[in-house]
Amino acid sequence: MTIMRKQHPLAKIINHSFIDLPTPSNISSWWNFGSLLGLCLTIQIATGLFLAMHYTPDTTTAFSSVTHICRDVNYGWLIRYMHANGASLFFMCLFTHIGRGLYYGSHNFVETWNIGIILLFTVMATAFMGYVLPWGQMSFWGATVITNLLSAIPYIGTSLVEWIWGGFSVDKATLTRFFAFHFILPFIITALVMVHLLFLHETGSNNPSGIPSEADKIPFHPYYTIKDLLGVILLLLMLSILVLFTPDLLGDPDNYTPANPLNTPPHIKPEWYFLFAYAILRSIPNKLGGVAALIMSILVLALMPLMHTAKQRSMMFRPLSQCLYWILVADLFILTWIGGQPVENPFITIGQTASLLYFLIILTLMPLTSILENKMLKW
């Protein structure tokens, strides 16, 4: 068996990636989230495939086809809620994975980090299009509001929006193309994940201390396969609790009302995992400025390797940077909360302050604090 996995062309790739992979001996549970994201992606593709067998991408039947899945298809309710709540867990793991990368300086693996940012954008696009498919009130109005943001682009904006819609409003053509993209994108994500891993295995994993670990590495299997298994069990437990006890906890009640272009919901808001970016978008009164801030809220991650001014890679031994990091995390929680609130005071002011603080910490305070820490260490 050992000889086969080391000699067979296909088994050799798997062996070098998941079995005999030299891994730092001190990586903590924060490194579990990569494998958990792989599990989430697998769950989403599997459940999505079964949903696609029964779903009809047509404005007249989309809503009732989802109802049919929940009521008439064998375990259809389970598949549907696993898919919906699986997306939420996917984003929880994704944000934690990025947060861990920021904390321990993993952004210094520039190629891996940049592919990760492309992956984040792709996953967000996939999730957005998936949210439109049930064709409830929030699906329709969410699609209308978010796609309409492109009209802020000078000169080509209006034409671009109508091109995406396939008409003069969100309608049958929009739903059909969103379903097509929502179906194909997870496979593109899978390909990008392979590239992400390819670049990661070129450099090897980072570790909590941030110092090179060539002198102390252990094989991935059995040590980290067992460690990852614990994370897998906990994730599946969380998903089971969500799906079986509170399946609609993270959803919007408005989405149980069929889409009606003549009736606007009082508060249009996306799913919880987009609320931080939505709050940043709303905090700027100008439409084009808001769209620019929305894109920059994610794209700012690409600047992290350029703004790493610290002599130490990880934040493990940098208490000032740690304080700033946790303020940033708290700020993101505040932005998420604000994104779900109506546009009125004091929420407008809180949102604007939190948005300013978000960019201020990442673009200014973190690099300056790192320079200060270098001085304190006489580096």
Swiss-Prot record:
Q: Where are the transmembrane segments?
A: 33-53, 77-98, 113-133, 178-198, 226-246, 288-308, 320-340, 347-367
PROSITE patterns membership: CYTB_CTER, CYTB_NTER
Q: How is the cofactor bound?
A: Binds 2 heme b groups non-covalently.
Report membrane topology. Answer: Multi-pass membrane protein
**GO CC terms in record:** mitochondrial inner membrane; respiratory chain complex III
Q: How does it assemble?
A: The cytochrome bc1 complex contains 11 subunits: 3 respiratory subunits (MT-CYB, CYC1 and UQCRFS1), 2 core proteins (UQCRC1 and UQCRC2) and 6 low-molecular weight proteins (UQCRH/QCR6, UQCRB/QCR7, UQCRQ/QCR8, UQCR10/QCR9, UQCR11/QCR10 and a cleavage product of UQCRFS1). This cytochrome bc1 complex then forms a dimer.
Protein name, UniProt field: Cytochrome b
The protein's organism comes out as Arctocebus calabarensis (Calabar angwantibo)
